[in-house]
Each structure stands twice: as structure tokens, then as C-alpha cells.
Regions:
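Amphipathic alpha-helical interaction segments
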Residues: 23, 39-41, 80, 154, ...
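Regular secondary-structure segments
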Residues: 12-16
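Membrane-interface anchoring determinants
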Residues: 2-11, 25-29, 33-103
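Charged, low-complexity interaction regions
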Residues: 19-20
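A residue-level detector for the "anchor" residue at the start of short, highly conserved motifs
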Residues: 67-74, 85-374
Length: 374
């Protein structure tokens, strides 16, 4: 029996608005599972496997070409809202080798104030360094924890900075002595002061991208510095993207309030807003914050973004080089939602299906060209 496209989309809209009844949710899941079973791709879990369902939605529901990508992205966003665990049941297209390139993982290097380098990838769990009044511990889940040493609470003897660096294909989380948490994205570095005792300035320096959950301390502002760009907060959740190869610096606010300063320019952000520093000017726009922090949640999430911008993020995470056979392809726009923890072929397949480009993987290089007419 042919699927009623409008009815399926009505169910998706209800999912997105959180108004779907349990019966309607079950109906949508049943619709998906029937098609998955037909192709012998049948998840065992009662909850729909997010990426498999996303691909099925994209293939099964046909809409006019001009709005197909946006509707597909909306459907994928719904699955993110539901919070379904990610599993992949995808069949790569002929142009993409499924055995090509694996995703990034928890990798980082800790550079101590004296220049000593400690590979957090290779170091055993437990205490890995002690400095003045600071103990540094590696946990078993990609997390580095700074704590004030016992009986040294409130002392301010430590000085200098440590640096945590993630390579391409790496990410790491840091917990500071004040309880603040920082997630560091691929190819980024974070410079941290050793002195986090009471009265000391809470100031870190970022190159690359990081998500911050800052502990609220009214008398001690927390400042994130990226070159001439600074974000000052008291306690809030926000994301800063400040890669050297990007044309701008973006600060996205999820909770609380932050003040963004660059030179003589300054703006205050409210939740749901993003500042953009480009060519010395700061602009502010309303955004879907899920896109800004999707990387931290384990997803790629792009909404009508330029292909060149998308591939910068892809290259950092998979540690690959990207070559455009035609510079005009850099301006192509795409929507894509997929897990970051799968081979690169999954993302490339999605983009091939939704656009007019094709990808060729040669070693650690991705070649992008125009799709050949059938």
C-alpha cells in the first residue's frame, strides 16, 4: 500500500512539536520498521535507530526538489529531539568505499608549564601530574580533571599555564577546580592557569572550538580569550568556535548571559543568540543552538551550509585533506545530520544523495567533483 506522504509528514511535525500521541509515535515507528524489514535491515531495539530511520525517511518520502533538503533535515532534527541512540544500518553508494576512514576519538596532549608533554591517549587512568596546589587526573572516559590538592584549598602559590591540545581526529573534556566543564573539539587547544584558588582570575585561552559549562561564581567572572576576541561570563553554557582557518569567530549561547568583546566592539547575548566576529565587526543573530553544539553531542548537523564550511569540520574530525575539483562547488549548500562516530562514507553518502556532487576517497584525501549525468 503506497505511503500517504502528507500523513507521514503530519506525524513528523507532531514529533517535532512534541504533540504526538504514543499511538502516533508507534505508527511512525511501525511505518519505518516495515520498510527496514523489507530490505532485511531490521533494528532489534524497540526504539528506532536514529540514523537508519533518517536514511529511510529521506529515501521513502519524495517531495519537490526545491524543498527536499529542508524537510529531510527537519525529520532528522526530530530524531535528535527524541534522543534516540545512534546505530547505523546504511548501504554505501557505489562511489564511496565503506572501508575508507574511521572517525575521531578521545585524543589529546597535555603540555605542562615546564614544557613536559603527556599523551592523554596513552597515559594510564589516574593521577598523571601534580603541580604546586593542583592535581591532574585522567578518568576512563576521555576526561581530564583538575582539582586543588588536599589541604591546599585557597592557596595561590601556583603560577603559569598548562595547555591541552587535541589533534585532528581528537576531542577531550576538562573539568576545572571550580567545577566548570569544557569540551574541546578536534584540532583545538586550551591554555589553562594553574591557579584556580579563590580570588584568582578565571581566564582561559582558546584556539579552535570548545563548549563551556561555567560554574556560577558572581564575584569571579570567567573569561574565554581567542586572540582579540573575549567572552566574559559569570555562569552559563555556551560554545565558542575560533579556528584560525575560519573567516569568523562564533559564540553561541545556550543558557545564561555572556558579553562578547572585540576591540572597541561589545555585545551581550541572550540564550538562543549567536555573535559573529568578522573583519572587526560583531553581528548577532537568532540560531538553532542544537546546530552549534551538535559536535559535542556526537553529531554533525548542517542546515543549508556551504560545502567548503562543512568540509572544514569533516576534515578536522576525520583528519583528512579535501580537494575541490571545481571551486564553484565550494558554494553548494547542504543539510546533513549524522553521527560523528562512523566511517566517513556515511556522511559522504548522505551528501551525495541530497546534492549534485560526488566524492572519491583516495587514502586520506577526499576529492569532490560534480555529479556525472546519468
Amino acid at each position: 500500500m503506497p505511503v500517504d506522504q502528507e500523513y507521514i509528514y503530519s506525524l513528523l511535525r507532531k514529533y517535532k512539536d512534541r504533540t504526538a500521541t504514543e499511538a502516533e509515535k508507534e505508527e511512525l515507528v511501525s511505518w519505518y520498521r516495515q520498510r527496514a524489514e523489507r530490505d532485511s535491515v531490521f533494528p532489534e531495539d524497540e526504539h528506532v535507530v536514529a540514523e537508519s530511520m533518517r536514511v529511510r525517511l529521506h529515501h521513502e518520502i519524495t517531495r519537490p526538489q526545491h524543498d527536499r533538503r529542508r524537510q529531510w533535515l527537519a525529520a532528522a532534527s526530530i530524531l535528535l529531539i527524541i534522543g534516540v541512540s545512534v546505530g547505523l544500518y546504511l548501504r554505501p553508494t557505489a562511489g564511496v568505499d565503506p572501508g575508507d576512514i574511521t572517525p575521531g576519538s578521545h585524543q589529546a596532549m597535555l603540555v605542562l608549564v615546564d614544557g613536559t608533554k603527556i599523551s592523554l591517549t596513552e597515559a594510564a587512568n589516574g593521577n598523571i601530574a601534580s603541580q604546586e596546589n593542583i592535581q591532574i587526573t585522567k578518568s576512563g572516559d576521555g576526561q581530564l580533571i583538575y582539582t586543588l590538592a588536599p589541604n591546599r584549598q585557597g592557596t595561590a602559590t601556583a603560577s603559569g599555564y598548562n595547555t591541552i591540545e587535541t589533534p585532528k581526529g581528537g576531542q577531550y573534556q576538562v573539568v576545572l577546580p571550580d567545577g566548570s566543564k569544557i569540551w574541546l573539539n578536534a584540532y583545538s587547544s586550551l591554555r589553562l592557569p594553574l591557579n584556580f584558588s579563590e580570588g584568582a582570575e578565571r581566564r582561559v585561552e582558546l584556539k579552535g572550538e570548545a563548549y563551556f559549562e561555567v560554574s556560577h561564581q558572581p564575584t569571579r567572572p570567567f573569561t574565554v580569550v581567542s586572540g582579540q576576541h573575549a567572552v566574559q561570563v559569570l555562569g552559563t553554557h555556551f560554545n565558542v568556535k575560533a579556528y584560525a582557518d575560519e573567516p569568523d569567530i562564533k559564540t553561541s549561547l545556550l543558557e545564561g548571559k555572556v558579553r562578547v568583546t572585540a576591540g572597541t566592539h561589545s555585545v551581550t547575548l541572550a540564550p538562543g543568540q549567536q555573535s559573529r566576529l568578522a573583519e572587526g565587526n560583531i553581528t548577532v543573530a537568532e540560531i538553532d543552538t542544537r546546530e552549534a553544539v551538535a559536535w559535542k553531542e556526537g553529531y554533525f548537523m548542517f542546515d543549508d551550509e556551504r560545502l567548503e564550511d562543512i568540509m572544514r569540520s569533516v576534515a578536522r574530525w576525520y583528519d583528512v585533506e579535501v580537494v575541490f575539483d571545481n571551486d564553484a562547488l565550494k558554494e553548494e549548500t547542504f543539510g546533513a545530520v549524522t553521527t560523528r562516530f562512523t566511517r566517513i562514507s556515511t556522511l559522504l553518502e548522505i551528501m551525495e544523495q541530497t546534492g549534485d556532487v560526488q566524492f572519491r576517497v583516495e587514502g586520506k584525501t577526499i576529492h569532490i567533483s560534480s555529479k556525472q549525468p546519468v
